[in-house]
Design a protein with these regions (language model features):
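Primarily recognizes the serine-hydrolase "nucleophile elbow" in alpha/beta-hydrolase
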Residues: 194-200, 204-262
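Catalytic-loop region of hydrolases
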Residues: 37-117, 375, 426-428
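Short beta-strand/loop motif that positions the catalytic acidic residue
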Residues: 352-355, 359
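Short beta-strand element of the alpha/beta-hydrolase
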Residues: 120-132
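C-terminal catalytic histidine-bearing segment of alpha/beta-hydrolase fold enzymes
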Residues: 329, 334-337, 361, 368-428
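C-terminal motif of bacterial Sec signal peptides marking the signal peptidase cleavage site
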Residues: 33-35
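Alpha/beta-hydrolase active-site loop
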Residues: 179-199
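Accessory cap/linker subdomain of secreted extracellular hydrolases
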Residues: 57-61, 244-344
Length: 428
């Protein structure tokens, strides 16, 4: 645990913000003063799921071309914030659109812990959240966070780490969320780091990126995109749990085993989100041409609702893989899978990967394939296997191991990983 002079109570936002403003540059001051919530925007008909969030999330003027620039910020509500943070801030910053490479705005949040920052500033962690849906109203900085994630992030804040948490491209902000694609996920994380470090929040230059599920993919992606996209950042470690691996052989990473295709499984709802991404990759693709009549109502929910609502609808309508489609989506979803692949597995950043042995959302076999392939690529992987934990359980269940890993990463200790011992583990 990082030593802190922790205050006995959570300070009011105004008191802490005043201290922050004294330290901050004129650019940050302008950003803080110009941020405003306004009233929720009307839902856009052009992009399903757009709108329903305050005007803060839409930048009305021309976007600066420089990625990682803080555009504005404002306090989060108590429901959107974290109890172990002295400062809970919503942010809007510039990033790069994952497919066109044009400038976009991306939203997120910054959480500053209680107490006095250590010399060199608060050690910074960049959180990449798991799947929440594709509608703007699902953005964690607006909708809040699950109990699992709240517990997890509060644990890190209590240990003295500041956290920047991107919403990702198209969540909260205008445009379609490119669910699962690796480059926009990585860009959103990397530019969130740039934005808060440049804004003088008294943050360290060293950063650890951590994420779960879709966020595990994002965290791993930052490790491989960092060298070309944000070489100036000092990322000293990556922590990923429940990490999907689009390059795993066959269709196991998408569909599960053939025996599951007639089972009503909530995790199959992720396929509906992938269909929206398919439309982004190929504008001529019409998802409803592939869906059965039985599955179309659930698809409509996936366009405007968040993950738990999609899963509930999927189960309530008795949907399986086999009864959801009238035309096979495999070629389309394979294309999404290819577009989701990492450009390389090679990274010089130490990587912690935690796998729950009962994970059926990101299949254990595909996670092990990622670990083995990353090791073969020369990565310094520290893999931890938790036989009794499922996809969600691996998040907090890995804390005893991941906290030690992060402490070592920030200390500058060389971490060789445990690739040599991984061959003894066989996938189930």
């Amino acid at each position: 645990m990082i030593g802190l002079n922790r205050s006995s109570h959570v300070k009011g936002f105004g008191e802490v913000m005043m201290h922050s403003l004294v330290r901050s540059s004129a650019v940050l001051l302008l950003a803080l003063l110009t941020g405003c919530s306004g009233t929720p925007q009307a839902t856009s008909e052009a992009v399903p799921g757009d709108g329903g969030v305050p005007g803060f999330y839409t930048w009305a003027g021309d976007l600066p071309s420089r990625p990682g620039q803080l555009l504005r910020s404002e306090p989060l509500t108590p429901q959107q914030g974290l109890k172990n943070a002295a400062l809970n801030i919503r942010i809007l910053y510039t990033s790069t659109e994952g497919r066109s490479n044009g400038p976009i705005g991306v939203s997120g949040a910054l959480f500053i812990p209680e107490g006095t920052p250590p010399k060199g500033g608060w050690p910074l962690m960049a959180w990449a959240h798991g799947t929440v849906g594709s509608a703007d109203v699902c953005a964690p900085s607006f909708a809040g966070r699950s109990g699992r994630d709240t517990r997890y992030l509060n644990e890190w804040l209590g240990r003295g780490y500041a956290i920047v948490a991107t919403d990702y491209e198209g969540l909260g902000t205008p445009g379609l969320h490119p669910f699962g694609l690796s480059s926009p996920l990585a860009y959103g994380v990397l530019d969130s780091i740039r934005a808060v470090q440049r804004a003088n929040f008294n943050l360290s230059s060293r950063v650890v990126v951590f994420g779960q599920s879709q966020g595990g993919r994002a965290a791993f992606a930052t490790a491989v995109y960092k060298k070309t996209y944000a070489p100036e950042l000092n990322i000293v470690g990556v922590v990923a749990t429940g990490t999907p691996y689009p390059m795993a052989s066959g269709h196991a990473g998408i569909f599960g085993q053939d025996t599951s295709r007639d089972q009503v499984t909530p995790s199959l709802a992720y396929n509906l989100l992938r269909l929206s991404t398919a439309g982004l990759i190929n504008p001529s693709f019409v998802a409803t041409d592939h869906l059965s009549d039985r599955a179309k109502p659930a698809f409509e929910v996936s366009q405007r609702g968040c993950l738990h609502a999609i899963e509930r609808k999927f189960v309530a309508d008795g949907l399986t893989f086999n009864n959801s489609f009238r035309r096979s989506p495999e070629a389309v979803l394979d294309q999404v899978n290819r577009e989701s692949s990492y450009p390389t597995l090679t990274s010089d950043i130490p990587i912690f990967i935690g796998t729950g042995g009962k994970d059926v959302v990101s299949p254990v076999r595909s996670q092990i394939a990622l670990v083995k392939d990353a090791c073969a690529a020369g990565d310094r992987v520290e893999w931890h296997y938790y036989p009794q934990l499922d996809h969600s359980g691996a998040v907090n269940g890995s804390l005893p191991d991941s906290t030690r890993f992060v402490e070592k990463a920030f200390s500058g200790e060389f971490m060789a990983g445990n690739c040599g011992a991984i061959g003894a583990i066989r996938p189930r």
